[in-house]
């Protein structure tokens, strides 16, 4: 029982000052629960509202592709330079050190391979396991215009509903149907559908014409995929243009871990995303950091 004689009555309540609570201002997150906003504040830098995600989840359908043969040797040295790690639960448990203390976006869709129809995915992770792994978000593909469009949208809806119950953001990743053009009209459609379903983050591709319309028409943050390996200067230009036109960050894999110098490249990408460096300045940084 409390010692009532030792309880001192409070005196300084600062009655002349209204109570404040610093809000985490991120596009589309104002009505989200505290836990979900807290996870998003780990993914997106609270100062810049941007993020540099390092994607190395490719093995879930590609196997040990170039650069991902040994995650512990090729990818682990990059962890400290990334804001966020995007990977599968298998790699997270077997390779990623728990003490790295980086937010994780967990790949939560799968059940396909490059030998089959890529759009034929299922939810591959239960939400309680994503929570058990201390993930900050879960991610799944959505294939608008593909043979399995309906199933991929159902997968996203299932994850969103499960995520809302536990405060877990969901990132919808826009895969491209075989017969769909990679243009502004398609990605405006795909990103908007995913956001309308309730995804809190959208990962999509940058397009040269009309990307600002894609970003403006999507009510939640967009991060761009790196896509196929480009020359470093071109990849940095893509990053710069995407950020300049409304993207909230990048989720890059091959353009970092297949670079001539992956550490130098992720540092250059960070300079573009968080410090508004031009592609030219960032490429100069890449060359100066290159071993």
Swiss-Prot record:
**Positions of disulphide bridges:** none
Pfam families the record matches: DeoC (PF01791)
Q: What EC number(s) are associated with this protein in UniProt?
A: 2.3.1.245
Catalysed reaction(s)?
Answer: dihydroxyacetone phosphate + acetyl-CoA = 3-hydroxy-2,4-dioxopentyl phosphate + CoA
Show the GO cellular component annotation of the record.
cytoplasm
**The UniProt record lists the keyword ATP-binding:** no
- Zinc as UniProt keyword: no
Keywords (alphabetical) are: Cytoplasm, Schiff base, Transferase
Listed GO molecular functions? acyltransferase activity, transferring groups other than amino-acyl groups; fructose-bisphosphate aldolase activity
**Location in or out of the cell:** Cytoplasm
**Record: active site:** 203 (schiff-base intermediate with substrate)
* CDD domains, A to Z: DhnA
What's its job?
Involved in the degradation of phospho-AI-2, thereby terminating induction of the lsr operon and closing the AI-2 signaling cycle. Catalyzes the transfer of an acetyl moiety from 3-hydroxy-5-phosphonooxypentane-2,4-dione to CoA to form glycerone phosphate and acetyl-CoA.
PANTHER family given in the database record: 3-HYDROXY-5-PHOSPHONOOXYPENTANE-2,4-DIONE THIOLASE, FRUCTOSE-BISPHOSPHATE ALDOLASE CLASS 1
Give the quaternary structure.
Homodecamer.
Query: To which protein family does this belong?
Result: Belongs to the DeoC/FbaB aldolase family.
Q: What is this protein called?
A: 3-hydroxy-5-phosphonooxypentane-2,4-dione thiolase
Chain's gene name: lsrF
